[in-house]
């Protein structure tokens, strides 16, 4: 329905990005389609706990989805981009990749790992007109943050120089820019969308 609403041609694919058969599934799906030239890695989960209380499965679930999943999908779609000598790869990371966050050792590690993966890949493929960048959101107004008590949201906003949460459109605009031809000479960078929470 989303594709039809925008008057575009395309199709959707639902898959578990943590499984090793991702490559074969994507190949089969794209067999009769024009290979995509833009990849946005935005799948992610959280499973919070203090490190001493964190179970192995909590660590593995977050790392497998957020980091390994991004690796598997990127590797699968990279071949066609290299063949076409053009592509845009964008990873969604987080402000916690730089700042860390209480009870989110697994999530912070996965997002920091993505930033390292992105910069390494940028060095490998940028000579083929494939750019690789990250967008790192801070606190964004989502269904998850809407349920927080107002006093909690106010305290969180106090730590943001702009004194407010971002909107999903702020993240989407950053992704749209990095996917565009206007960003053709930008690679290996992290575009912070966090209202000034983290200033490298």
Task: Tell where the protein language model's regions lie, with residue ranges.
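Short-chain dehydrogenase/reductase
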Residues: 1-36, 47, 57-58
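Active-site loop-to-helix junction immediately N-terminal to the catalytic Tyr of the SDR YXXXK motif
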Residues: 54, 100-108, 120, 148
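Short, small/polar-rich loop/turn modules that mediate ligand/substrate recognition or access, typified
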Residues: 126, 131, 186-188, 194
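Alpha-helical segment proximal to the catalytic Tyr-Lys
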Residues: 79, 123-127, 184
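Active-site helix of classical SDR
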Residues: 74, 110, 118
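Substrate-binding pocket helix/loop in short-chain dehydrogenase/reductase
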Residues: 50-51, 55-63, 145, 156
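Residue(s) in the substrate-gating loop at a strand-loop-helix junction
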Residues: 94
């Amino acid at each position: 329905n989303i594709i039809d609403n925008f008057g575009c041609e395309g199709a959707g694919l639902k898959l578990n990005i943590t499984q090793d058969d991702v490559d074969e599934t994507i190949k089969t799906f794209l067999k009769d389609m024009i290979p995509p030239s833009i990849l946005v890695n935005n799948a992610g989960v959280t499973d919070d706990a203090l490190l001493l209380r964190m179970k192995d499965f909590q660590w593995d679930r977050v790392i497998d989805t957020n980091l390994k999943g991004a690796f598997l999908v990127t590797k699968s779609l990279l071949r066609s981009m290299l063949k076409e000598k053009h592509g845009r790869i964008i990873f969604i990371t987080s402000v916690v990749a730089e700042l860390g966050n209480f009870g989110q050792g697994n999530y912070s590690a996965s997002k920091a790992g993505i930033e390292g993966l992105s910069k390494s890949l940028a060095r490998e493929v940028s000579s083929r007109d494939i750019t690789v960048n990250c967008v790192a959101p801070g606190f964004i107004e989502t269904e998850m943050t809407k349920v927080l008590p107002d006093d909690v949201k106010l305290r969180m906003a106090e730590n943001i120089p702009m004194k407010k949460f971002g909107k999903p459109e702020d993240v989407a605009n950053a992704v749209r820019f990095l996917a565009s031809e206007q960003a053709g000479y930008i690679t290996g960078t992290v575009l912070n969308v966090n209202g000034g929470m983290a200033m490298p």
